[in-house]
């Protein structure tokens, strides 16, 4: 089950889907999260590492939940 995560600061190392307008645009493992917690870098299962910014309306949906 996927869980939408609004606070990205705890997502490092998690398996996620990045969505935009309800569609999955990327899936992979979060490598890094910015200090402000609004930008993350994901290593997709296919392709090269990409950055996503919450301010651009991207959503993070966790496959593996972040540690609490």
Can you annotate each of these PLM segments?
Residues 1-68:
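Conserved RNA-binding domains used in RNP assembly and mRNA/RNA metabolism
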């Amino acid at each position: 089950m996927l869980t939408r995560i609004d606070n990205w600061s705890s997502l490092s190392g998690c398996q996620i889907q990045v969505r935009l307008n309800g569609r999955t645009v990327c899936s992979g493992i979060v490598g890094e999260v910015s200090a402000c917690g609004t930008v993350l870098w994901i290593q997709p299962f296919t392709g090269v590492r990409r950055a996503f910014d919450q301010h651009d309306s991207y959503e993070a949906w966790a496959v593996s939940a972040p540690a609490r």
